[in-house]
Amino acid sequence: MANNYDFPKTREQLNQLVADLSQLQTNIQQTHWYMRGENFFRLHPLMDDYNDQLADQLDNIAERLIAINGSPYSTTHEFIEHTGLPDEKVTWDQLTMSDFMQRLSDQFKYLRDQYQKGIEIADIEKDFPTQDMLNGFKEAIDKNIWMINAYLGEGPYDE
């Protein structure tokens, strides 16, 4: 009898998302600490909101991974080894507020693409609960991109 609940490629992609979400949270925290400028009071708490959003997504993805017989990455070493996002040291005087926000937009676009990949893989493997979860998370990331790009004077799909 075939195992209808074996989703190896979905598990692999969920683990990719675990690594990427963990790194993105670190990058957002870096922005939170080092941002300066006239929009500081508005953007500084927004970074907390983004990290709260990503922490919720990360927890749900890791728990879904366990539910489908996977083992989420759980060490800093694993996150750094597997993430597709940069691990860059910056200081407050290296980047402008717009630079930080552009970097954040680019990283959210990367995450959006990883969610899309996960949605497609889950569809192929017929893991529809995972697909539903990722659709909701991608929708939230799409909104983040739209709003950040509007701040930058761009459209949501401007590259």
Task: State where each predicted segment sits.
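Amphipathic, non-transmembrane alpha-helical scaffold segments
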Residues: L14, H44-N51, A55, M101, ...
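Disorder-to-helix initiation segments
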Residues: M1-L17, M97, L104
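Short conserved catalytic/interaction loops centered on acidic-Pro-aromatic/His motifs
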Residues: D127-Q131, A150, P156
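Conserved alpha-helical segments that form or flank metal/cofactor-binding pockets of metalloenzymes
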Residues: R42-F79
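A structural signal for well-ordered alpha-helices, especially hydrophobic packing surfaces
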Residues: V18, Q25-I28, H32, N51, ...
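Long, contiguous binding/interaction regions
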Residues: A2, M35, F40, D52, ...
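Helix-loop segments that flank and shape redox-cofactor active sites
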Residues: A2-K9, L24-D49, Q114-P129
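Acidic/histidine-rich alpha-helical segments that form the ligand environment
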Residues: D59, T83-G136
